[in-house]
Amino acid sequence: GNDKCKDTLFRYIFTDLQFALPLVNAFLGTSYKNPSSIEITTVEDMLQIAVENETLILIDCRMMLCEKRPAPNLFTYMPFLDCYCLYVNQKQAEECSQDSSRENELPEPCLYRLYNGTKEDPEIQMLKLSDLYKPKVINPDSLLGEVEATLEVEVPLLNIHKGLNEELMDICAPLREYSECIDAVKEEIRKGRSTREGIVQMLNTMDPGASIYAKIQSGRAEVERMLETEFNLNEYGEVLNEADTLEKAVEICKKMMVNPLCTIQMIQELTGFTEDEIHEIQEKLQSR
């Protein structure tokens, strides 16, 4: 794969202001109607939405790394922290250049991770950064023994499988329609179709009345590529979860490398290998 970050269907849809507005309203309980109220950028794999310079919404939506993971890993949190710190640093630099004496206010961060789970998975789980802290033996009589961890990040993990989190879906029709697209492909695969066949069938039978229909169909070739990438990565992730040796993980890494749709970043996140380790595996693969 190459190093260029590949887009996802979720970001393809929700970087469009007409679809981002109802998403913002669904998460914040607001009723914004003017697209100029929000500013959308994409950083790393995140959809970053700044709402009137007061609130920063960071949304990460993906199929992989969620459905069969027994516990969240570091990647659940680090992209959120990196994106928020980058945004704050940029805003502070802008404001300081205008008035260095004024105390800067920070935008309230709203962090969400969405995933296409199953109907049996919980609608919502709360992921905490402190769950990843390495336990330490602390003297209970010391100051550290009397206080909890001083740095905490909580990220709601929302299952957007069809029929779940209906309150969100009722407010944001594009989110419901996105979820239905993913579920439709999964259903076709369960019937025995290949991933590509399932994607094509979903696109051929998609409801023309859906708000995202025109955007999906106008970029159909790109949508097919994005969905095929996401489903392939999800499949790699499920196989990787069952890999009980380093050798098996390396073999999966090699399979991803020969897939032109897989980037180094995707391989890193899915396997846990560093970039140097991936390049080393790649060199051995090419020297054969």
Describe every region a protein language model picked out.
Residues G1-L168:
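Accessory alpha/beta interaction modules
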Residues K4, T8, F27, L56-F75, ...:
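Short, charged alpha-helical interaction segments and adjacent helix-coil junctions
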